Structures are given as C-alpha cells and as structure tokens.
C-alpha cells in the first residue's frame, strides 16, 4: 500500500514523541520497501510477505530487533503498517474494483487520495530518513527475519539496503505529491480518464461499499478506518512490548497478531488477492508480441 504519509503518521502517532522517528518511519513502510528493489526476487518476496504466514514474519521481525532501541522502533513501525493495511485495504480494493474487475492503477490512485486527505488535515511534514549506520543495522535485522521466515532465500543484503534507501527517498517524494491539490488521474477499463479525489473517498463510503472478501456492506470511511487502524496499532505495540519483556510467548503473540493478509484483512490462507486487470492485459500483449515474433522467424 503506497500511502506513505498515512502509514508514517499512524506509526508516529501511536509511538509518540520519544521514539526514533526516522527508524519508525522506515518501519512504517513495512514490506512495501522491498518493492523498491531493482531485483525481481526481492519484489516477489515483498508481495509474499503481504499475504503469506504474516504473523510468523512479524514475530521474526520483533525477535530480530529486540536488543536495539532504534530497531525496536523500526519493528513497531512495521506492526503499524500491518494494522493500517488490514484496516484500509478492503475499502481500497472495493473502490478499485470496477465492472471488468480489480484495477491496480485505481488502487494506487485511491491510496494517493488517502494520503492527500490526511496531509490536508494533518499538515505535519514527513520524517527524515535514518542515517547510514541506522539503516545498516535495520537492514541486518530485516535480513535476519527474512532468513528465519524463508531459509532458502538467496538474499542480497546490499540490494535489500538499497531498497530501504530508495523507499525512504522516493516514498518521501510520493508523500509530498499526495498532499498536492487535485487528484491523481487514471484510466478506467473503457479508456475513460477518471479522478480519485479525497472528497470522493467519503462520498464512496457514505454510499455503502461491499467488502470484496466477506461481502459485508459498510459505510465506514477514512475517519472511521483510521480510528480502527490506530486502535489496532496500539494493541499490537502493547503486545510487542510484552513479548520483548518476556511477558508474552511467541504463540500468544501470533494469536494477537491474527495471521491476516495485509491485502484482505482476513486470514491469509482463505483470502487470496485478486489479479489486477492490468496483469491480464500485459499477458495478452506479450502473447500477441511473441506470436508475431515467432511468425517473423519462420
């Protein structure tokens, strides 16, 4: 979920003024940071972390970050990312699903509008990126958690670190764009230009929207969903602190985390993400291109 500003504000609101804001802000990028890798393997891993064995990985992150204050703030930011995604993504997917199916471009536009909405009422600037030594330490802990979660991963630590740096750099630029007046323009499935604006978000919510996974109709909009996300973030941070103090074991922590998909907000095994319309179109173009190429060779 590329709502950088919303993720960061949720994490820093829950963690308070005494946290390491740079580390927590990087943690608030969650698994999205891996999408900024130049390596397809890391991007694919980022996708899997959103919708497979989610509680298990979060426990590994907390374990890997337990003995360093800045890394603990990073891990709690990561928990906040999970809480915000679980709260908001059903709404985002509902708004991104059109007659022909789910559109990843409209998903992005919706999340930019969410950032614009929150930046418009918050007006708090984004946190700065962690310094080099802090990023190196966080990178090592994140890499350790990944290897615990998937031991056969061929992890390039240098590329993982580059992804973290790009995430904070490009994420900051996108966060500022999210606060600009106006809306992000996208094309619908008929090729007609559409807008997704902050005002549309609340109007869509008030008209009632259907959760794509549960079928439940809701009128909750950005304010209600943000309230739910902040409440859940507070619960997860409290559980993490109990775990670090030895007052909660890993199995209990997993139960508190809920093992939910970041995308559906439901149990990950029973709520696979929809395939974007754009992916099907890309495959169709590739088939036509490869067919024409093979005919030319003959």
Label for each model-derived stretch:
Residues 1-76, 83-298:
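N-terminal leader/auxiliary helical segments
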């Amino acid at each position: 979920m590329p709502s950088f500003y919303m993720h960061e504000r949720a994490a820093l609101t829950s963690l308070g003024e005494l946290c390491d804001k740079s580390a927590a802000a990087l943690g608030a990028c969650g698994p999205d940071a891996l999408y900024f890798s130049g390596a397809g393997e890391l991007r694919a891993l980022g996708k899997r972390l959103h919708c497979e064995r989610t509680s298990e990985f979060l426990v590994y992150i907390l374990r890997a970050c337990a003995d360093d204050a800045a890394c603990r703030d990073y891990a709690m930011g990561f928990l906040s990312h999970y809480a915000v995604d679980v709260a908001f993504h059903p709404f985002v997917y509902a708004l991104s699903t059109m007659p022909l199916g789910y559109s990843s471009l409209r998903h992005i536009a919706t999340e930019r509008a969410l950032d614009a909405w929150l930046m418009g009422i918050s007006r708090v600037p984004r946190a700065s990126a962690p310094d080099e030594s802090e990023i190196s330490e966080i990178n090592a802990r994140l890499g350790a958690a990944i290897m615990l979660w998937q031991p056969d991963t061929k992890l390039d630590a240098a590329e993982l670190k580059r992804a973290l740096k790009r995430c904070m750099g490009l994420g900051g630029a996108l966060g500022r764009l999210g606060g600009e007046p106006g809306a992000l323009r996208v094309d619908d499935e008929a090729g007609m230009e559409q807008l997704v604006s902050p005002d549309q978000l609340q109007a869509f919510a008030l008209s009632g929207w259907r959760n794509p996974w549960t079928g439940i109709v809701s009128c909750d909009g950005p304010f209600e969903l943000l309230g739910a996300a902040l409440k859940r973030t507070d619960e997860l941070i409290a559980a993490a602190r109990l775990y670090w103090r030895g007052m909660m074991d890993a199995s209990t922590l997993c139960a508190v985390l809920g093992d939910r998909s970041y995308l559906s907000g439901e149990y990950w095994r029973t709520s696979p993400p929809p395939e974007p319309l754009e992916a099907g179109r890309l495959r169709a173009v590739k088939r036509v291109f490869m067919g024409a190429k093979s005919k030319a060779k003959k």
